[in-house]
Amino acid sequence: MHGLLVVAWLLATNASAQNTATLRGIVADSLSGQPLAGVSVGLQGQPGGTASDALGQFRLGGLAAGTYTLRAGALGYRAQAVPVTLKAGESQRLTLRVATTTLSLAEVTVSQPRDPNQSLAAISHIDQVLRPMNSAQDLLRLVPGLFIAQHAGGGKAEQIFLRGFDCDHGTDFAVSIDGLPVNMVSHTHGQGYADFHFVIPETVEQLKVYKGPYTARFGDFATSGAGEFVTKTRLDHSQAKIEVGQFDTFRGLLMLDLLGNDRHLLSKKPESAYVAAEYYFTNSYFDAKQHFKRFNGLAKYTGQLSDNTSLTLLGSHFTSNWDASGQIPERGVREGVISRFGSIDPTEGGRTSRTNASAILTTTLGHDAVLRQQVYYSRYDFSLFSNFTFFLQDSVKGDEINQRETGRNIYGYTGTYDRDTRLGARTLHSTLGMGTRIDDAGLDLRHAQRRQITDTITAGRLFEQNINAYLDETLPLTDRLTLNAAVRFDVFTFDFRGVLANEATKELEPLRGRLTRSIVSPKLNLYYQLSPTVQLFARSGFGFHSNDARGVIRGANETVLPRALGYEVGSTFKPVPNLVVNAALWSLHLQNELVYIGDDGNVENTGPTQRYGVDVAARYQLSRRLFLDTDVNYNHGRQTDAPADANYIPLAPTFTTIGGLTYKAPKGLSGSLRYRHIDSRPANDDGSIRARGYFLFDAVLSYTKARFQIGATAENLLNVQWNQAQFATQTRLLTPQRERPAGFDELHFTPGTPFYLKLNASVFF
């Protein structure tokens, strides 16, 4: 299969016409002279285009000789147009300097020629400019239609809901930061566990959102979509920030620019380097103090080593520990056993840490090809004490468990080769990608009592490897119609060597095995530019559902990599200059839906599922500084082989909407009033237990000057009682009445945040 990919790519890229020209250069801020990343660059009236990279560099290749108008623009910058004359065989360089201006949605374009599958780019760019980012939760909420829930004192990864999926902690949504994968394969707590708390929100510069299985560079975990976060290449200024709030909350942040505008480290060409550190503490709003502590550190260097080579180095460290109150049963609150913010087992909690190192080398080769290579390493530890069923299994010691990872090592490489090839009057953009990821970890699941280990359920050593390759081709068939076709090939090796307790005898028995499986995932997407303000798209693609190595070895499902098939039609359009709308009608079928059972260390196959829905996102500029936004999402999902009276997909969101009104000024007062709503939905197969919906208001206010900023954030302005994480669970309580041994199956929940006020102050230097 690798050979077929390479041959297909060679045939595509060697069909080039002769004597074409190349235009390359740098986009910089007109005041500071600093290179700017993410600026759209293209030739007026011509299909295709590109965006400046981390060093502000851009390249347009395979151009016919002639005179063009080069346009460059980005949100918050005044668009610039420059006439350019190119000769056959010429490679011309130039520098574009763009000036800042007030944000104007009239400047937003509806297409992304270099990355057409990023149809939410316009929406995402607007949100990144308008919404303040103060937490990992804020970052994830930038994904249109995505909802999150936290249910362990702030220490665990958030539960994610998107496109009719309860993604658990990341099973069906792939997350990365600077090319580093966040999701954990075969994690001891949940497949695809995506703990994003090691990211300092103020360092994030860009988010790319891809919904559905339509993009070839995403494989594992990307059933419902993927989010690519990118940290800043450079700081506009150094910053010190302090935040204090209710419930003993404190946060400190320090970000230092190490090079400024005129210092150099490895070369005399453009370079940047900075460090950032964050400390956070809170006791939270529960009756039992949570003692949550987190530290984050980041260092990043980006530099142009030569005219054709750039290097990015990144290192980060994160550590966290906490106590938790866990999910509580409704009957416990109703009968007065505990308060709404109480706990059945106050000894829950955990600790975790992650250290990352990454190097990215980007090289411009002959024929205007670009080779990008990344190597990365992560070291990860995790230990979590939970009690999901209280005294259902053991009426004396209780049902507390400890899920632990000891020394997970992640080794990875990704490489892409990009090239533009002239095919007559058209330019074919080809990307050949290859990569591998290896996870090596100790996984333990044990019984515990008040955080003291009592016996082992399963334990062993994980080795899991993914090798992948893909070929992605984008070709403008006409001036309006663009074709994107791709194919991805994945190979997985699942290896687990350990023990498993016999359910009858409780004796530990060997659990060992090794299995290799592969899968091919083709994609086909069409984009039609109906007018400068209307783009239509039709997308389709195969993907696959992720799987846990322990479930694979135990034979939980004959189909190791269940297929996913998705379709989508929609449009990004501007009915008036100041209104941007993205709308999509989508469908997704899963061959089998796999659910990880955390307290058993196994995987449950719930059978095939079918989902469809409608996503609408709109951004409107009411005046020069006033903006309105809303996302509305409807999802319908069912288990297709289950009886009609028991075919719901538990916890799958049905209707969600978020939105807000924002006043944004470059200096002085800014503010935002926002809402979020998720509808009630079935929590079990037959819908007899329902997770309760909520409607909340949040607010942000800030005052900014050149050297300082002060602000306030308020969550749940109306102090509504709401449930954050919710599950249908069978549990038993040791109340004075001694509940029946079989316990009760009902809704369990983690209470949502009450009114929560935080104040912050920043100094820029």
List where the protein language model places each region:
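Face-selective signature of the C-terminal outer-membrane beta-barrel domain
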Residues: 304, 308-318, 350-501, 527-529, ...
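Membrane-embedded beta-barrel scaffold of Gram-negative outer-membrane proteins
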Residues: 364, 370-388, 529, 535-543, ...
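Short, acidic, small-residue-rich periplasmic hinge/interaction motif at the N-terminus
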Residues: 28, 32, 40-44, 73-77, ...
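Gram-negative outer-membrane beta-barrel transporters
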Residues: 418, 586-589, 605-685, 760-764
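Transmembrane beta-barrel wall of Gram-negative outer-membrane proteins
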Residues: 246-282, 286-325, 349-366, 424, ...
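Short acidic/polar hinge/loop motifs at secondary-structure boundaries
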Residues: 181-211, 229-230, 556
